[in-house]
Swiss-Prot record:
It comes from Streptococcus mutans serotype c (strain ATCC 700610 / UA159). It catalyses: [HPr protein]-L-serine + ATP = [HPr protein]-O-phospho-L-serine + ADP + H(+); [HPr protein]-O-phospho-L-serine + phosphate + H(+) = [HPr protein]-L-serine + diphosphate. Residues 264-269 are annotated as: Important for the catalytic mechanism of dephosphorylation. ATP binds at residues 153-160. This is HPr kinase/phosphorylase. Mg(2+) binds at residues 160, 202. The keyword ATP-binding applies. The Walker A ATP-binding motif also binds Pi and PPi. It comes from the Bacteria.
Amino acid sequence: MSVTVQMLVDKVKLDVIYGTQELLQKEIATADISRPGLEMTGYFDYYAPERIQLLGMKEWSYLTQMTSHNRYSVLKEMFQTETPAIIVARDLTIPEEMLLAAKEEGIAVLQSHVPTSRLSGEMSWYLDSCLAERTSVHGVLMDIYGMGVLIQGDSGIGKSETGLELVKRGHRLVADDRVDVFAKDEETLWGEPAEILRHLLEIRGVGIINVMSLYGASAVKDSSQVQLSIFLENFEKDKMFDRLGNGNEDIELSGVKIPRIRIPVKTGRNVSVVIEAAAMNYRAKQMGYDATETFEKRLTNLIDQNEASHD
């Protein structure tokens, strides 16, 4: 997904001090944000002009102590064709030399009242989300008790119907059919719907329904971290399934591993309730309580007691 300067302006509510419509449509190539410190002294080795240039109190203070000529020279060298924009935080005064250099080089000048570190974090979060490489997977992504659960399985097994039942039980739909996943970092996976499928569920025999229209805004979510994969598969009498919950299986999506739980599906089984329980049990494990481990300890103690009674 490409991101323009205008999209960034709208998302983090920046003020446009200078920028034609053409300049605001310039694409941002990287999520990295530069705080030009050494560049202010004239040291431009390893300078990354393709990044958003963000000036906070320290950079601004140093810049304002320069002579007008030196200030213009530094800014002129800093502003290059591939530079998307320069942003001044904290509503600090924009030097005239900055506007002059920006107009000459064709660089948008933006301003924000937000403190520098917070502004940098907001922009990084947004740009990382937009510019991260995406992988499309088949399934239903639900927010269950605040945890992102990716429901997968063979076609026709009832993933969308299960998603609808979970919505009726108070959980939130993120995406149905196609889920676009991307890595926020090495350990964090996020998912979102394809734009054309946002808020929609396809139910066999009924057709396409708009979950937001039928159940309200509280029933949908635009994106979610993906923390758990539930794989639905047809129940087979002779097939072995994990009965104790101590079988560890992971899947890797966009370079991030997440745990997977396989749930057998057969007529009469309330799959949505089972998925709720699986999600809550996984969260309990993350908080340090493992029911399987507790059971195994009780079983071991019982065996030890029986052996002691026979001695």
